[in-house]
Amino acid sequence: EDAIPLFGWQDDGWLTMSNNPTTNHAEIVNWFKAMKAKGIRIKQVGHDRKFCREYFIGMKSAGFAIIDQPQYYWRKSEGFRRIEQKAKDGKLYYFGADPFEYCLSNVRAIKKTDDMIQYEKVEETHRIDVFDAAVFACCRMLENLEKSEKAKGWLNE
């Protein structure tokens, strides 16, 4: 239905989570734990708590710094623009991940006022999860960058 080549992605090591209609929040928490155990440094995770409060609580209980990050289009626009800029500059690196390319091909951008971008699925049954996660990660990085610059200014005074 969503045109994901499940067996191919599984064979290539890209498919690490289930493809069920709903997601068990504990499965995602365990995935993050496994990534951390492999040595991947995870500074923060942004998540809109209104979509799964149990996941939010589970991540905090597992020791992750999870930040409430509502999915406002005007906020996600900044992350989208960051990805767009890196792509245009030839500096977008996504490990050649087929799932990222698949999700990117399912995204349509809609220009709003003041050059804001709202994006949506091209096909309702197709997925954009990996792209959406990349946008969220860009938003977290940009917000942290701003906070660290403010802190440096305050400490240097």
What are the residue ranges of the model-derived segments?
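Short, surface-exposed amphipathic charged segments that create phosphate/polyanion-binding patches used
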Residues: 80-89
